[in-house]
Regions:
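Short alpha-helical patches at protein termini and domain edges
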Residues: 1-179
Length: 179
């Protein structure tokens, strides 16, 4: 339960070592075994791995195909990140969106590095055989990236209709360019 509170409230791992928190735990139970920040970190990581495994199993069990959005994002700090989100319809016909990966992606973004990262994400989640389409920003490097991924997946016959529906351009990005 403590690991869930740390995640939910974005608390540091050493929260469990705060003197006031330790006193509260001791007050509630004199026999409590106090844990360290390393134990707290290990517990959070264990919970993450369990949740990730649950999501993997869920993605494997859904009857529908999975659509992806991929975003390369640069906040004001000039750090760069890559975000891969899965979208699917569950067995109750509810649209579900799950961020699968969000990680640091230092510049530059050469095509080979980006492709390797994306293909590793797909393999890691075990969804290569379930893809329907991917939405990317309109950029020439994204077109090249999408073409290569489509070619790679089509070699194994993994895409519907030979992948003609595989690349969907980002409508919001296009509208923003028009405005």
């Amino acid at each position: 339960m403590l690991d869930e509170a740390i995640i939910k409230h974005n608390l540091p791992f050493n929260f469990v070592e705060y003197e006031g928190i330790r006193r509260v735990f001791s007050y509630l139970n004199l026999d409590v075994k106090q844990i360290s920040k390393n134990t707290s970190k290990a517990d959070v990581l264990k919970l993450y791995k369990k949740e990730k495994n649950d999501v993997k199993n869920k993605l494997k069990s859904i009857p529908s195909r999975i659509c992806l959005t991929l975003d390369l994002w640069t906040p004001v700090t000039s750090e760069r990140y890559i975000c891969l989100t899965a979208h699917y319809v569950d067995e109750n016909w509810k649209l579900k969106n799950i961020i699968l990966n969000f990680c640091h992606m230092p510049p530059p973004h050469p095509r080979t590095l980006l492709l390797e990262k994306i293909l590793n994400f797909l393999e890691e989640w075990g969804i290569v055989k379930k893809l329907f389409f991917i939405t990317l920003y309109n950029a020439s490097n994204n077109d090249n990236c999408q073409d290569f991924i489509k070619k790679k997946l089509n070699e194994g016959g993994l895409l519907l209709c030979d992948g003609i529906f595989f690349h969907v351009r980002c409508g919001a990005y296009i509208l923003n360019l028009i405005v």
